[in-house]
Regions:
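Short, surface-exposed charged micro-motifs
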Residues: 1, 132, 260
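Beta-rich carbohydrate-recognition and catalytic domains
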Residues: 4-73, 78-188, 194-254, 268, ...
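Hydrophobic, well-ordered secondary-structure elements that form the walls
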Residues: 192, 261
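Extracellular glycan/ECM-engagement signal in secreted proteins
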Residues: 263, 267-269
Length: 323
């Protein structure tokens, strides 16, 4: 997972490390997935040596709900657009964790130290799997987590922005019902992105929420679902936020899996996703290689990593443009 500071050339990458497998019983608090922070000060041209943060992050929860295994969901770590405490705008990362599901951690020093959003006892998505975070226009934090046939959502509201205190709503499952395409029953992680937009029919300023997922019965047909956030009532609580999607755009017509996206400087959506699953031994230099056994447990190497630059008008069939 990666983020670049909005006011400098500093880049932070958070990576799972070591030789443990998240789902194995042998991976536990005494033999955990390791977590490494890797930093660049020149926009990614050069990188410093990795710094292990395993104990600093796992230790946040030792006195409340101890974690046996965890990692930061791959893709985008998001940096707040509105919350700045000290030198940096706040960054947030969603942990895939067991037992008791997702946790959200945040940092005000760009990943040198971390705290638990909502406190160490908070369990925002107890049934969650791989997850991502985003920010509403008013600074509240959304977590969106992988589940079969949809996404889990929850919403964090601050009581005190500076100290990070506040409260989570209840985890809520959304199935994007009413669409011709439905989220996959064999899911992967996707990405949420909320962009400032203009409704093209009348010029009204709104926000548009995007959520990418694979669709159908397998890991296929990665698509981006979209929903208008016209005013505060559309995001008054987690249920209002999760319900009532307006449409979707199918990015891939074939086998496709994990995805991530962010807003580019040119107001287009940078969309990254996995496509074209490569079976073990069929390609001499696969882009992604299974870990840690080489051939992996499912007899495949991995996928091609694909980048597309998409206009919001394309994703929403001309209904919105970025402002």
């Amino acid at each position: 997972a990666i983020v670049m500071d909005r006011e400098s050339h500093e880049v932070l990458m958070m990576a799972v490390a070591g030789c443990t497998v998240y789902g194995y019983a042998s991976t536990n608090r005494h033999n955990p997935n390791l977590i490494a922070a890797i930093r660049s000060m020149d926009g990614g041209l050069t990188w410093q040596q990795p710094i292990e943060q395993t104990e600093a992050i796992y230790g946040l929860f030792d006195q409340t709900h101890p974690i046996d295994a965890a990692f930061v969901g791959g893709g985008k770590i998001f940096q707040s657009r509105v919350v700045k405490v000290g030198r940096y705008y706040r960054i947030y990362a969603a942990l895939t964790a067991r037992p008791k599901g997702n946790r959200v951690i945040y940092s005000d020093d760009f990943g040198r130290t971390w705290a638990a959003l909502g406190g160490p006892s908070a369990l925002p998505v107890p049934d969650g799997d791989e997850a991502k975070c985003e920010e509403l226009p008013d600074g509240r934090v959304v977590i969106t987590s992988r589940t079969a046939g949809g996404r889990w959502f929850n919403l964090f509201t601050y009581d005190d922005v500076k100290t990070g205190s506040g409260r989570w709503d209840e985890q809520t499952k959304d199935t994007m019902s009413g669409m011709a395409l439905m989220p996959s029953t064999n899911p992967t992680n996707g990405e949420m992105l909320i962009v400032p937009a203009v409704r093209t029919s009348d010029g009204k300023p709104v926000h548009v929420m995007l959520q990418s997922v694979s669709t159908g019965t397998g890991r296929n047909n990665v698509s981006i679902f979209y929903k208008e956030l016209a005013d505060a009532s559309d995001m008054r609580d987690v249920r209002a936020l999760a319900e009532g999607w307006d449409g979707y755009y199918q990015v891939s017509p074939t086998v496709s899996m994990y995805s991530s996206m962010d807003l580019q400087a040119d107001h287009r959506i940078a969309f990254f996703y996995e496509e074209a699953l490569t079976r073990w031994g069929s390609k001499p230099n696969p882009v992604s290689t299974s870990f840690p056994k080489g051939e992996g447990e499912h007899n495949y190497d991995g996928c091609e990593n694909v980048y597309k630059s998409l206009a919001l008008e394309t994703i929403t069939a001309g209904k919105y443009r970025v402002r």
